[in-house]
């Protein structure tokens, strides 16, 4: 098993993790029974981890969402998708590796799956462009979604990107147009669409595959109009104020559910999805099945109408003296 990568605020666990690894090595190299000591240490580590993660700040949740060992789109595909066939190309000469898509089945139900894909290390991240899709990626996604619409396949999208690639070549190739076209076309698709923020949901890069009938988020995922670092640089000319920006942006699942932006917050294992990926996969699979079953009861016209209404109420201007007054104006959803 790969060595666990601990975040800054997990430092209280470092010594415990070292002791656990030492005991495991001792068990492998000798016949000494250390099961009792190992159980005690793992129980203590789990308890401390739970204490840390139940009170994370928005800035700390961003660190969890960006964790290099957090399950990715292709990880989840391997966990619960059968007969997976990845489809390539935008039919315009490109095949963006930062946004993957293909056809598979979940419990014998054919579906189209799209998602941003980050790498595990520097080499993979260069290939995947750190999960930042270029125009060709969004055009590939649209081609596959239109394919799904033609053959009546439900669409599942997994969002995990700091944002769409903002390089010169992306602008020259029409990044804004590609994302805008996806937004327009997704409103007219006649099949159910369930989007899930599995890690980082950043700006237009997330929206490019985020127009959905149901928008879900993992507990420690984030969904934001701009990265806190970018926001702090714009508002205060100081990227060091990113933690303050993270709090002000309301980027967590709890805040976004309260604001009516998302439809459900999915719980994560203690320590985040990277500590128990299979548990995270089971949680995601169950949520997808629940929402797909409900959406498949609706007619095509009802799907389109409800999807339009869902997004039409976003951005409503409300005058208020404080944020709690704004919350009171919004229909509340329960977790």
UniProtKB/Swiss-Prot annotation:
InterPro entries in the record: Acetyl_CoA_COase_a_su (IPR001095), ClpP/crotonase-like_dom_sf (IPR029045), COA_CT_C (IPR011763)
Pathway annotation: Lipid metabolism; malonyl-CoA biosynthesis; malonyl-CoA from acetyl-CoA: step 1/1
Residues annotated as domain CoA carboxyltransferase C-terminal: 40-294
Keywords associated with the record: ATP-binding, Cytoplasm, Fatty acid biosynthesis, Fatty acid metabolism, Lipid biosynthesis, Lipid metabolism, Nucleotide-binding, Transferase
Keyword flag Transcription: no
A Gene Ontology term for the protein's cellular component: acetyl-CoA carboxylase complex
Coiled coil segments of this chain: none
Catalysis performed (reactions): N(6)-carboxybiotinyl-L-lysyl-[protein] + acetyl-CoA = N(6)-biotinyl-L-lysyl-[protein] + malonyl-CoA
Localization per record: Cytoplasm
GO annotation, biological process: fatty acid biosynthetic process; malonyl-CoA biosynthetic process
Its EC number(s): 2.1.3.15
Superkingdom of origin: Bacteria
Pfam families with a match to the protein in the record: ACCA
Location, primary (coarse class): cytoplasm
Statement: the UniProt record of this protein carries the keyword Repressor: no
GO molecular function: acetyl-CoA carboxylase activity; ATP binding; carboxyl- or carbamoyltransferase activity
Cross-referenced NCBIfam families: accA, AccA_sub, PRK05724.1
SUBUNIT field: Acetyl-CoA carboxylase is a heterohexamer composed of biotin carboxyl carrier protein (AccB), biotin carboxylase (AccC) and two subunits each of ACCase subunit alpha (AccA) and ACCase subunit beta (AccD).
Family: Belongs to the AccA family.
Function: Component of the acetyl coenzyme A carboxylase (ACC) complex. First, biotin carboxylase catalyzes the carboxylation of biotin on its carrier protein (BCCP) and then the CO(2) group is transferred by the carboxyltransferase to acetyl-CoA to form malonyl-CoA.
Name by which UniProt lists this protein: Acetyl-coenzyme A carboxylase carboxyl transferase subunit alpha
Organism the protein comes from: Prochlorococcus marinus (strain MIT 9215)
Classification of source organism: Bacteria, Bacillati, Cyanobacteriota, Cyanophyceae, Synechococcales
């Amino acid at each position: 098993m790969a060595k666990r990568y601990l975040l800054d605020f997990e430092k209280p666990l470092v010594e415990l993790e070292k002791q656990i690894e030492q005991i495991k090595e001792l068990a492998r190299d000798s016949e000494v029974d250390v099961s009792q000591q190992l159980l005690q240490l793992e129980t203590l580590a789990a308890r401390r981890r739970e204490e840390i993660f139940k009170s994370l700040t928005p800035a700390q949740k961003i660190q969890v969402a960006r964790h290099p060992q957090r399950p990715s789109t292709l990880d989840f595909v391997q966990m619960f998708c059968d007969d997976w066939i990845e489809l390539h190309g935008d039919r315009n000469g490109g095949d963006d590796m930062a946004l993957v898509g293909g056809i598979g089945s979940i419990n014998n139900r054919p579906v189209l799956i799209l998602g941003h894909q980050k790498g595990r290390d520097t080499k993979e991240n260069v290939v995947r462009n750190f999960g930042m899709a270029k125009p060709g990626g969004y055009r590939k996604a649209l081609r596959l979604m239109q394919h799904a619409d033609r053959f009546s396949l439900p669409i599942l999208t997994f969002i995990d990107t700091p944002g769409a690639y903002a390089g010169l070549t992306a602008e020259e190739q029409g990044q804004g147009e590609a994302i805008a076209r996806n937004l327009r076309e997704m409103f007219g698709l006649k099949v159910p669409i369930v989007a899930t923020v599995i890690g980082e949901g950043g700006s237009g890069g997330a929206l490019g595959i985020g127009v959905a009938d149901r928008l879900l988020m993992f507990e420690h995922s984030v969904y934001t109009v701009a990265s806190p670092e970018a926001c702090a640089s714009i508002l205060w000319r100081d990227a060091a104020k990113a933690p303050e920006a993270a709090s002000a942006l309301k980027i967590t699942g709890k805040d976004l559910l309260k604001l009516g932006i998302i439809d459900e917050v999915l719980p994560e294992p203690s320590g985040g999805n990277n500590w128990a990926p299979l548990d995270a996969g089971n949680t995601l699979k169950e949520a997808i099945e629940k929402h797909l079953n409900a959406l498949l009861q609706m007619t095509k016209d009802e799907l389109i109408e409800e999807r339009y209404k869902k997004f039409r109420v976003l951005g409503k201007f409300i005058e208020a003296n404080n944020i709690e007054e704004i919350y009171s104006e919004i229909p509340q959803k329960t977790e």
